[in-house]
Amino acid sequence: MAPNQRPKVVITGASRGIGRGCARAFGTQGAEVVLVARNLDELQRAVDEIVSEGGCASAVACDVTNAEEVRSLFGGLERCDVLINNAGMNRPQPFLDVDLATLDELLSLNVRSMFIAAQAAARLMARQHSGVIINMSSQMGHVGAANRSVYCTTKHAIEGLTKALAVELAPLGIRVNAVAPTYVETPLTRPFLENEAFRGEVLQRIPLGRIGTVAEVVAAVMFLASPAASLITGTSLLVDGGYTAQ
């Protein structure tokens, strides 16, 4: 990267929640942020927010489960310094009731799309001999849980992908890590956390006794993307209030 050049940061799932929080944080710190999601209207509102605060941002409508769209997106970039691989979803179901449509949808979005985005970004980063990839995992990538067989499968896969890429891409100057949050107040989790019984059960499992915030997850992402983490690769930073320590 040339002196005084803004680092280019690509964030998938950037229209809301953790992705949007990351976009705003990178934007306020001087990065050129490319926000990626399917809903262009929501993306544009996020871009407008960043620009109004003096940041540099653009929106790209892209279905990350479509390999050609993802490759076209990265093919149109001159460089990529950081990829925040954040798009994902959850659909809790008892294991005996899991239908193939749910299995395929979560594998496609939570695993396949992240693999393809990481590959496309890494091809750019390899030319630069530098770059950072951060995969959004979950505490469920470290444990098991009832009604989350598919989600746990996908997040354990992301933990494995992170380690494999860290080893393979290190000689190319590319660091790869994961961030693994506990339950965080986002549009994705809100329907579950509004159930008082479920919320109480969750809080009982978290030693620090509270739900996480977007800002706390964003802080972990910003650290792993920063020079302060220059010797860190192949790890998963748990932001879970002690959930997995038990």
Question: Locations of the language-model features?
Answer:
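Active-site helix of classical SDR
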Residues: 118, 154, 162
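Residue(s) in the substrate-gating loop at a strand-loop-helix junction
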Residues: 138
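Alpha-helical segment proximal to the catalytic Tyr-Lys
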Residues: 123, 167-171, 230
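C-terminal substrate-recognition "lid" of short-chain dehydrogenase/reductases
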Residues: 115-118, 175, 210-239, 243-245
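Conserved glycine-rich cofactor-binding loop
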Residues: 15-17
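Active-site loop immediately N-terminal to the catalytic Tyr-X3-Lys motif
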Residues: 96, 143-149, 171-172, 209, ...
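Substrate-binding pocket helix/loop in short-chain dehydrogenase/reductase
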Residues: 94-95, 99-107, 202
